[in-house]
């Protein structure tokens, strides 16, 4: 496994797993229990053959989005802070991309988990994804979601901050979809 330390991508991966709580009692009461759970998860993931180059089905990305959706459903009202359900996300992306095959920039000022941005990418060839998200946990979810879906770090820029108080887009795209 390669490190991003000193690489061009270092800033893009900085803090990606900061919100992971491996000491949470939800994983087990003791350190030994938590270690066993994490070992089983890692071993299970290592045993899965994911040859994403040979298939159009994004197994890991779909599983990740499914888990985000399940978490959102169980989170109740708070879920609206980070997850746009599949139906509305699909409709919005279809409307935004109507008649487009290439999109220079797709931007979401309240990116959440990034599912809406990714849906736009299902309807048009998006060159660059932009987003901003207020909460650090959801900001990291968004970045992980884009990475797991095969979006190269050079092709997205997600900011962590309050879009209304501090718009990090500046002179960057501020529309949802920009025609190429």
Feature map (PLM): residue ranges:
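Conserved S-adenosyl-L-methionine
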Residues: 78-177
């Amino acid at each position: 496994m390669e490190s991003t330390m000193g690489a061009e991508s270092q800033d893009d991966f900085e803090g990606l797993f900061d919100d992971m709580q491996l000491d949470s009692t939800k994983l087990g009461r003791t350190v030994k229990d938590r270690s066993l759970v994490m070992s089983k998860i890692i071993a299970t993931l290592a045993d899965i053959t994911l040859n994403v180059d040979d298939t159009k089905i994004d197994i890991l990305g779909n599983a990740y989005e499914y888990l985000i959706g399940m978490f959102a459903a169980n989170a109740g009202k708070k879920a609206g802070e980070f997850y746009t359900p599949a139906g509305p996300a699909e409709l919005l992306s279809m409307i935004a991309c109507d008649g487009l095959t290439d999109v220079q920039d797709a931007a979401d000022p309240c990116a959440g988990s990034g599912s809406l941005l990714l849906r736009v990418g299902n309807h048009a060839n998006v060159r660059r994804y932009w987003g901003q998200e207020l909460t650090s946990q959801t900001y990291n979810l968004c970045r992980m979601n884009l990475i797991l879906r095969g979006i190269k770090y050079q092709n997205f820029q997600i900011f962590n901050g309050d879009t209304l108080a501090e718009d990090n887009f500046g002179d960057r795209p501020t529309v949802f979809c920009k025609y190429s």
